[in-house]
Amino acid sequence: MAQISLMRNLLILLFFGLLVLPLKGQTLKRLSSDADRNTVRDTTNTRNSVRPPKQEKQERPPIELYKIISVANDTTIVDTSLTIKKLYKYNYLRKDNFELLPFSNEGQTYNTLVHDFSGEEVRPIFGARARHFNYMEVEDIYYYNVPTPLTELYYKSVFSQGQNLDAFFTMNKSERFNFSIAYKGLRSLGKYQHILTSTGNFRFAFNYQSKNGRYDLKAHYVAQDLLNQENGGLTDQALTNFASDDSQFSDRARLSVNFEDAESILDGQRFYINQRYDLIPQNDSVNNNRIQVGHILNYEDKFFEYRQTSPATDLFGESFVTSNLTDRTDLNDFNNRIFVEYSNNLLGTLNFQVNHTYYKYGYNSVLIQDEGRIPNLLQGNLIAAGASYKKFYKGFQLKGEAQANVAGDFSGFDFDAEASYQLKDKAFFSGGIHINSSAANYNHLLYQSSYENYNWYNAEDYKNVKTSSIDFDMKSSKWLNASASFVNITDYAYFALDTDGFVNSFQTGDNVSYLKIKVNKDVHFGKFGLDNTVAYQTVSSGGSYLNVPEVVTRNTVYYTDHWFKKSLFVQTGLRFNYFTKYAMNAYDPVLAEFYVQNEQQIGEFPLLDLFFNMKVRQTRIFFIAEHVNSLVSPSNYYSAPGYPYRDFTLRFGLVWNFFL
């Protein structure tokens, strides 16, 4: 951990060194090309000194030139406005978390209120999913093209003794080469015993395009370490004390927890390179044909580790060790993809690709039990082949993509088809089908732990999880935003309690049918606004394996105005979140996974926030009073069984853009 801390400090020092150096050039100056002829003699000076001409300050380039490019080459521009959507994204994840319920401390996990089954992987993915909410994947890294250096600082206060800062810097070294460097760090002690969080996400990315435009390169390096102290939740007596609303327990540190000697860390590094080359020069706009060859390299090395000084045998069962328990799971994943893409104005775009993946998942030793032998590794090679098609025609867009494993120990395929239509400037409609078959996550197939009950090998017994869905989406600022998805899952893999009361992996042969409808509308009345988002969910079959709240809603009433001769923009109002009661998933710290429980119903507690936000130039300032109603409402709010939700808290922060 000392090495991680040292590396983190060095990276922060490097970043701020890069940040400070360009500050000397904030005022760009332009001198006359004929300086000698335009100098002016100062006749009042006995030394006949030469006074330089008055220097001109360059105007900042238009905001439209500051471009953000996704890995899929979708381009947006830097947005410094203060909207209600910006308020929703002002959180630790930097994205709208309407479908999630956070735990009490910043940087802990989230319980999922609204589910998403749109995954397109054809091979297993790493477990410890409860720790991956802030783990940045390939699609979370963006690339930039900016006319002048750009810096963004994000800050938000946390829950006692710490801070959350996300610092970002990008610049173009030339018209065709850009790099960016960023670091997001968090430390928060929390209000309850032993829930400190300490996380870091370092990103470095660059993109390049050759002078003739035929070669394009995107690449990034990401290093992430996400550490959480674990306490197992409140004890039974502490839960009673919490619900009693006794003032002596308003200091949450007085509430006893199940243990105070455990911590877990998710650590990962990734190297990513995405490059393509045009075989046919695009010098003539009449040229309708384009052939590109490309290569994508993605190497990731990650591990999850759970450490505990004294095993909590009363909660997790007997242990092979009596002290200093350490469970570590590693994954090395090395993927190479080569593709050929043909584009034609009449026919559309057709892509063929071949993937090779080397994977090595597991542990250092084999476990021999009375019930059998549990191996230490899942290791091998996978080869997959696929194709995709895309065509635009008079407002319509057709897209299709298919991929299947053709060699290796894991079978799997993915098929996605979508049609969309842009109705002038009124609305965008899309609909499609998605079919996927892939192995369950690695920690369902193989898991080893010092806790005797947390050892299993299911790779030979589990079938592929098969998911099929029909989706519809409409986006319209004039009407409303709406989406609907009907999902059917067979051979669904999940975690739940076994007959002995310990968490284990299960796979059901029953169908799980899930319907989700989500609607959003932002209505304006002069300077007032009302933004409503409602999600409806139901599980028509398989309700014992997938529990969801029937209704999740967020309603925000707000007022906006310009003050002080339009030098200050103000946004103030209240935000109301609510979800119906249901059998909420419970959290297991050993696995860092949520598991199904059907005994305790949680929900139907409102969450009311008050906010007063401001924008001055390129700075957005936020003042948020979170969960105000907890001051007068009963203590019946939980993020998971045994884990209370946040109490009333005042939060402050800002997002500041510098255009240097």
What residue ranges belong to the model's regions?
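Hydrophobic h-region of N-terminal signal peptides that target proteins for export
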Residues: F16-K24
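Solvent-exposed loop segments that connect transmembrane elements
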Residues: T235, A243-S247, G317, D370-P375
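A solvent-exposed, charged loop/short amphipathic helix patch at secondary-structure junctions
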Residues: T313-L325
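Membrane-proximal, glycine/serine-rich, low-complexity loop/turn segments characteristic
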Residues: Q26-L266, I280-N288, S420-K426, G642-F648, ...
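Terminal non-domain segments
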Residues: R8-L13, L255, T313-D314
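Positively charged n-region of N-terminal signal peptides that target proteins for export
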Residues: M1-L10, Q26, I181
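Exposed, low-structure sequence patches enriched in small/polar residues
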Residues: L10, F15, V146-T148, I265-Q308, ...
